[in-house]
């Protein structure tokens, strides 16, 4: 297994987020052409094969890909510069998303894809550990205050990951998912990131939102060939966000504790 260097970026020596946003590699889907090479091309084609499959359960992702709305960040490794690169790209994405007009056709999702050199693991749990390590490192370099109204502890139903002042929902997808195929976007580990508010608009705790969620969860069960995870729920209604970031293969109760800790806690 080539996962990530334990403690490599922990403690002192955190990289600083580039305030100017220079060297950020936020790539628009519409910019991707034949010049995309190597593992970037492999990863993009894997993702395309999923999101053009009519059976893929997330209709919002399929719509975004069909309309070339998806944004990408490709991460080469797990060093300081790689975290800096990802942080700058994520900051640009947050800035792009701040003035969202509420329309589905301007709801740009972000897919962060990691090379096999950054992480190659043997299990879903190991990929999740890497994903949480990345989120912890992003939190460490984020100079923006945590948004008011969002709890700082992931064991609260009112917590979500935040970056550059924006609450986010993050989906960890990995090649180790053999049962939950809807969380497998191909040969590379990926974080699928959206602003938290979009789920409240399209699939929140309203009659129409509950209908959307029910439809998607039915599609998940058919696509995966197994009932959807017990941990799936709506923000602020008792379900824990962090458990939905990384789903386990089995349908079971979970008693594990989120590895994310708020800076200074």
From Swiss-Prot:
InterPro entries: Uncharacterised_YqcI/YcgG (IPR014988). Disruption phenotype: Cells lacking this gene do not produce cycloserine (DCS). The keyword Protein biosynthesis does not apply. Disulfide bonds: none annotated. One of its GO terms (molecular function) is heme binding. It holds the Pfam family YqcI_YcgG. One of its GO terms (biological process) is antibiotic biosynthetic process. It comes from the Bacteria. Keywords: Antibiotic biosynthesis, Heme, Iron, Metal-binding. Its cofactor is heme. PANTHER family: YCGG FAMILY PROTEIN, YQCI_YCGG FAMILY PROTEIN. Belongs to the DcsA family. Involved in the biosynthesis of the antibiotic D-cycloserine (DCS), a cyclic structural analog of D-alanine, used as an antitubercular agent. Could catalyze the production of N(omega)-hydroxy-L-arginine (NHA) from L-arginine. This is Putative N(omega)-hydroxy-L-arginine synthase DcsA. It comes from Streptomyces lavendulae. The lineage of its organism: Bacteria, Bacillati, Actinomycetota, Actinomycetes, Kitasatosporales.
């Amino acid at each position: 297994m080539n996962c990530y260097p334990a403690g490599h970026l922990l403690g002192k020596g955190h990289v600083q987020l580039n305030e100017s946003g220079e060297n950020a590699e936020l790539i628009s889907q519409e910019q991707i052409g034949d010049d995309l090479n190597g593992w970037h091309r492999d990863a993009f084609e894997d993702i395309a094969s999923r999101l053009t499959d009519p059976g893929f359960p997330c209709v919002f992702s399929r719509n975004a890909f069909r309309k070339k709305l998806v944004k990408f960040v490709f991460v080469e490794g797990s060093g300081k510069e790689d975290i800096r690169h990802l942080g700058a790209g994520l900051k640009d994405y947050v800035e792009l998303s701040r003035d969202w007009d509420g329309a589905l056709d301007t709801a740009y999702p972000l897919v962060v894809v990691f090379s096999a050199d950054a992480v190659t693991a043997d299990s879903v749990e190991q990929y999740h550990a890497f994903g949480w390590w990345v989120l912890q490192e992003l939190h460490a370099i984020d100079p923006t205050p945590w948004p008011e109204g969002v709890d700082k502890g992931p064991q609260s139903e009112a917590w979500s990951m935040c970056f550059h002042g924006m609450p986010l929902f993050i989906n960890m997808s990995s090649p180790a998912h053999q049962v939950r195929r809807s969380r497998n976007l191909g040969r590379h580990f990926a974080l699928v990131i959206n602003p938290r508010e979009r789920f409240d608009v399209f699939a929140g705790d309203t009659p129409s939102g509950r209908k959307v969620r029910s439809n998607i969860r039915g599609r998940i069960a058919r696509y995966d060939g197994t009932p959807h995870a017990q941990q799936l729920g709506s923000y602020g209604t008792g379900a824990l966000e962090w458990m939905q970031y990384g789903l386990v293969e089995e349908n079971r109760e979970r008693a594990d504790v989120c590895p994310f800790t708020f800076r200074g806690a």
